[in-house]
Swiss-Prot record:
Single strand-specific metallo-endoribonuclease involved in late-stage 70S ribosome quality control and in maturation of the 3' terminus of the 16S rRNA. Gene3D superfamilies: Metalloproteases ('zincins'), catalytic domain. This is Endoribonuclease YbeY. It comes from the Bacteria. Zn(2+) binds at residues 126, 130, 136. GO terms for molecular function: metalloendopeptidase activity; RNA endonuclease activity; zinc ion binding. It comes from Sinorhizobium medicae (strain WSM419). GO terms for cellular component: cytoplasm. It is found in: Cytoplasm. Its cofactor is Zn(2+). InterPro entries: MetalPrtase_cat_dom_sf_prd, YbeY, YbeY_CS.
Length: 168
């Protein structure tokens, strides 16, 4: 399994304790990295690649979203790759940053009738794929990214977030 050095920062919001977020995130992102290495032949280029996770609130992510994407509203997750990478290529030692907003995550989980942890898992996987160059701007890119998310989540015992299919 690939080693990830995950730095956690709880900036704002009613998040679980930092040590719980750390161990939870390690399980999720190690599974995603292992999947990409084995199934997509996109391994990390270093023994221990680094990324940071920022757990924050809607107010903070709204400001980040406005500054970096020109959208003056909160969103669930934002990813900032350290370096440009395209799907199928190996990322460098520094992967980048993933920022998750608590209120949006909780609201979406309730609307989707999904457990908070399941939706957080999905958003972490989604953000992680962005660090590897995957995107969802074009329909074909979105379909590929959704398939990858679904397969990674299935490995973690979670159902398809885009449908009602049970885990494979």
């Amino acid at each position: 399994m690939t080693a990830l050095d995950i730095q956690i920062s709880v900036e704002a919001g009613d998040w679980p304790p930092e040590d719980e977020l750390q161990s939870f995130s390690e399980v999720v992102l190690e599974a995603a990295a292992d999947f990409l290495a084995r199934e997509e032949r996109q391994p990390l280029s270093a023994e221990a690649a680094e990324l940071s996770l920022v757990f924050t609130d809607d107010q903070s992510i709204k400001a980040i979203n406005a500054e970096w994407r020109g959208q003056d509203k909160p969103t669930n997750v934002l990813s900032f790759p350290a370096f440009p990478v395209t799907p199928g290529k190996m990322p460098g030692l520094m992967l980048g940053d993933i920022v998750v907003a608590h209120e949006t995550l909780r609201r979406e989980a309730a609307e989707l009738e999904k457990p908070f942890d399941a939706h957080l898992t999905h958003l972490l996987v989604h953000g992680f794929l962005h660090l590897f160059g995957y995107d969802h701007i074009e329909d074909d890119e979105a379909e590929r990214m959704e398939r990858l998310e679904t397969r990674i989540l299935a490995r973690l015992g979670l159902s398809d977030p885009y449908g009602d299919l049970p885990p494979v």
